Amino acid sequence: QLQVEVTFSGERIVNTGLSKTGCPYVWGSTGPNSFDCSGFTQWVYRQNGIYIPRTSSEQKAAAKKVVSLSELEVGDILWRSGHVGIYIGNGQYVHAPHTGDVVKVSSGVGKFTCGLRYQ
């Protein structure tokens, strides 16, 4: 029996997320060519062997560690009520913002409440 050990890599998470910039936001969509915010974070993590729940509230509940914004590490999920994104460093994050927009990089993590960690 083949066993594969998955090692968390924030850099791999970020690169997977950045590979989807420009994909349209579609409410309820989970990829691979369109996303809503939590569908995006779920898809990115799944591509890296980490299975997290579908909605932003479930993603927060499933986190192994909830961290303050001052403790963020590259690859953490940024969380606020109703929205999630992936921290890419230097105060920036990649996310699927809202209807009419596309997956993109934005600045200003202070809009979020906390970071979520799954390892």
Positions of PLM-derived features:
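Secreted/periplasmic proteins that engage bacterial cell-wall peptidoglycan
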Residues: 12-54
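Aromatic- and glycine-rich peptidoglycan recognition patches
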Residues: 3, 8-10, 15, 50-69, ...
